[in-house]
């Protein structure tokens, strides 16, 4: 069981009523708290929770409509996402309790200060390298629309400026990361047909490709509901239409693709995790048509080339710079 859940269960008597678990892990916590309900924005965790506790977790970027008497927020990685989630639950809980739980290495001690606008926070427990904080909501805020927290920036592309809408919690929030910047410079000679932006984040690559290749079908895929929402906003801001999907990795992608583009993630929260990318490299051939192309950017220190050649075919380094490389391979 996740150590954060174990800390909650040390105080299980506090969580026996109708409690919302925001950002909960995919463990047995719902089984131990029979009246609790989850709010999840990670598609993989949601699928695991649905398989074990069908109908007891809500997936998306907005707080569930159902009523709840208290809420536990599992500390997200991003400070602005924490603010959004805390605001969303506290706006529904005037005079009642909000709890914040997280690992010490995730910054829970500092994050506890984000409870200050609602009342006087206090530490209830510290165990398993985690802390549990509580506040009684004396100052219930007005709920903030998620779009009001978006950051917007423009990219000067050859086809004209591209407006990017980034929501809290999305990778490289409010700015273009160096890997995507390099890949944007090397979108030439992509195949016609169906293109996938894998791990789309705010939709930068998918929108740029749709702008440059308007007759191609473009799909954007991410595991995170906030990323998918950002991508939809980015597409709409530029008058572009493309399919946006949430799903856990390449297994959620369509078949028969002509190209897969990616600046793949290798962090989950504060943890390093290469599984999604390595799984992409192992299974890309299954999702690509014959002659279909994989084009991805990654940190130069990540040795992806042998894995690509093992599972897809000859892999070339198309470009490199600023500590990143672009790999290109075709399904033979």
From Swiss-Prot:
Q: Which GO molecular function annotation, any one, does this entry have?
A: 16S rRNA (guanine(1207)-N(2))-methyltransferase activity
Q: Which residues form a coiled coil?
A: none
Q: Transmembrane ranges? A: none
Q: Keywords for this entry? A: Cytoplasm, Methyltransferase, rRNA processing, S-adenosyl-L-methionine, Transferase
Q: What class of enzyme is it?
A: transferase
Q: Does the keyword S-adenosyl-L-methionine apply?
A: yes
Q: What is one Pfam family matched by this protein?
A: MTS
What the entry lists under CDD domains is as follows: AdoMet_MTases
The EC number(s) this enzyme carries: 2.1.1.172
> What InterPro entries does the record tag this protein with?
Mtase_sm_N, rRNA_ssu_MeTfrase_C, RsmC/RlmG, SAM-dependent_MTases_sf, Small_mtfrase_dom
The Gene Ontology CC terms held by the record are: cytoplasm
Query: Known catalysed reaction(s)?
Result: guanosine(1207) in 16S rRNA + S-adenosyl-L-methionine = N(2)-methylguanosine(1207) in 16S rRNA + S-adenosyl-L-homocysteine + H(+)
Localization, per the record, is: Cytoplasm
- Briefly, what is this protein's role? Specifically methylates the guanine in position 1207 of 16S rRNA in the 30S particle.
**Family that this chain belongs to:** Belongs to the methyltransferase superfamily. RsmC family.
Q: How does it assemble?
A: Monomer.
Under which name does UniProt file this protein?
Ribosomal RNA small subunit methyltransferase C
